[in-house]
Amino acid sequence: MEIRILGRDLEVSEIGFGCMGMSHAYGTVSTQKEAEELIEKAIDEGCTFFDTAEIYGTTEDPHHNEKLLGKVLRPYRNKIVLASKCGIRFDETATTVNKPLIPDGRPETIKASIEGSLMRLNTDHLDLYYIHRIDMTVPIEETAGAMKELMEQGKITHWGLSEASEEIIRRAHKVCPVTAIQNRYSMMYRDYEKLFPVLEELKIGFVAFSPLANGLLTAAYHSHGEFEKPGDYRSAMPQFTEEGLKENNEFMSWMKVIAEEKNATPAQISLAWMLAKKPYIVPVSYTHLRAHETSAHL
């Protein structure tokens, strides 16, 4: 797997491992053995970039993902780039599967969160630390200032923003240079292409989450009933309703034809498309059954 540069100097594999699905949002939780097998396979195929967040977990174990990775990634820590996120919590009063997020970008929250993440991840620093969502009640300059302090203390080496607008990016970058923006991006969701000019101007990388549209672009799902496991966020996503699947059927059929012509899979075609867009785009992907597909792209 080739290397890409986020920001000015953060070297990562061109496809990262989005670890959320091992603990959160897809209806199943990986055992340590399953996680070890997936991560070992990813590393063997050249993946060096692993993405998590303090909020990825279960009701019983809210920080499951970081704790799991703290055990599984420990033997590889000096060989990988480890990213995590802070600054949101779930609205536990909600009864929906996909609970609303409550942003919290206060400096005191960020400083408390990094200590918990470092402990759970069994490391003395993070290579990339994001504010997970933008808290519009806190000036972004204060959030950026807290990240700058963490960098000066050696607790993080780079920082980033998730789901940020151009205005927020520019204001944050003035306080402390931003290395990466992590936003939703795929063939099915291209709104953030409008940020590409400012990212190029400021030399900021773009990390794409949900690059396979939460699995839609694998062309493997055909019925809403496939997402009925408790905690599977896809049960509430419009693209996975019976109507949504029907509307996208023609596109998925076309993807299958293209994939067959290239002796590839729809997932590989999707990732190859993304990697060809810009040299500073790095998709982070997770699929239990497609760990090989996402790294063996075209």
Which residues make up each language-model segment?
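N-terminal binding-site loop/beta-alpha segment at the start of enzyme catalytic domains
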Residues: 1-81
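Short, well-ordered coil/turn segments that N-cap beta-strands
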Residues: 13-14, 46-48, 77-80, 123-127, ...
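Conserved, mostly hydrophobic/aromatic
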Residues: 17, 35, 50, 69, ...
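Active-site beta-loop-alpha junctions enriched in small/polar residues
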Residues: 20-22, 55, 85-89, 131-134, ...
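Glycine-rich, positively charged active-site loop/lid region within alpha/beta enzyme cores that binds
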Residues: 92-99, 200-258, 275-281
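Glycine/proline-rich, positively charged
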Residues: 93-187, 194
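Basic phosphate/pyrophosphate-binding loop/patch that engages nucleotide-derived ligands
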Residues: 151-152, 195-205
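Conserved small/polar residues in nucleotide/adenosyl-binding loops
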Residues: 287-294
